[in-house]
Amino acid sequence: MSTPTHNLPRTRVSAFCWVALERSTRIERPTSWSWKELSHYSLIVFHCIPDTTPKQIEECFKKFLRRPDIVIILINQVYADMIRPTVDAHNLAVPTVLEIPSKQHPYDSSRDSILKRAQRVITPPERHY
């Protein structure tokens, strides 16, 4: 197995481009990739192996947030919970961060950052008379 070329050794990155999604084709480079190779993708999904630390997940997540060519980040809710303050602090529309359920953990809508924001928009503020 070759050594990953990125500096987050325990994060496996799967990159999807819209054209590939339309054709139901998945482009994956689990062992070797570079930022240059991913430069033409607009949707990034990253999966973490079980012993990935929250710090490593957060570093990778922040790198994706800083990239101007990424518009959507999909993250399993269990990993978003590991870096919840960072996920909740991200309030820009682009890149949009979508939390998705994993096969091993149930989805909890009360912890989803997008649903929390939507609830704040829909719910009128309390009035004090």
Swiss-Prot record:
Keyword annotations of the record: Hydrogen ion transport, Ion transport, Transport
Superkingdom field: Eukaryota
InterPro entries registered for this protein in UniProt: ATPase_V1-cplx_f_g_su, ATPase_V1-cplx_fsu_euk, ATPase_V1_fsu_sf
GO BP terms, alphabetized: proton transmembrane transport
Alphabetized Pfam families for the sequence: ATP-synt_F (PF01990)
Molecular functions per Gene Ontology: proton-transporting ATPase activity, rotational mechanism
GO cellular component, one term: membrane
Keyword Ion transport: yes
Functional note: Subunit of the V1 complex of vacuolar(H+)-ATPase (V-ATPase), a multisubunit enzyme composed of a peripheral complex (V1) that hydrolyzes ATP and a membrane integral complex (V0) that translocates protons. V-ATPase is responsible for acidifying and maintaining the pH of intracellular compartments and in some cell types, is targeted to the plasma membrane, where it is responsible for acidifying the extracellular environment.
Similarity comment: Belongs to the V-ATPase F subunit family.
Subunit structure and binding partners: V-ATPase is a heteromultimeric enzyme made up of two complexes: the ATP-hydrolytic V1 complex and the proton translocation V0 complex. The V1 complex consists of three catalytic AB heterodimers that form a heterohexamer, three peripheral stalks each consisting of EG heterodimers, one central rotor including subunits D and F, and the regulatory subunits C and H. The proton translocation complex V0 consists of the proton transport subunit a, a ring of proteolipid subunits c9c'', rotary subunit d, subunits e and f, and the accessory subunits VhaAC45 and ATP6AP2.
Name listed for the protein in its UniProt record: V-type proton ATPase subunit F 2
Phylogenetic lineage: Eukaryota, Metazoa, Ecdysozoa, Arthropoda, Hexapoda
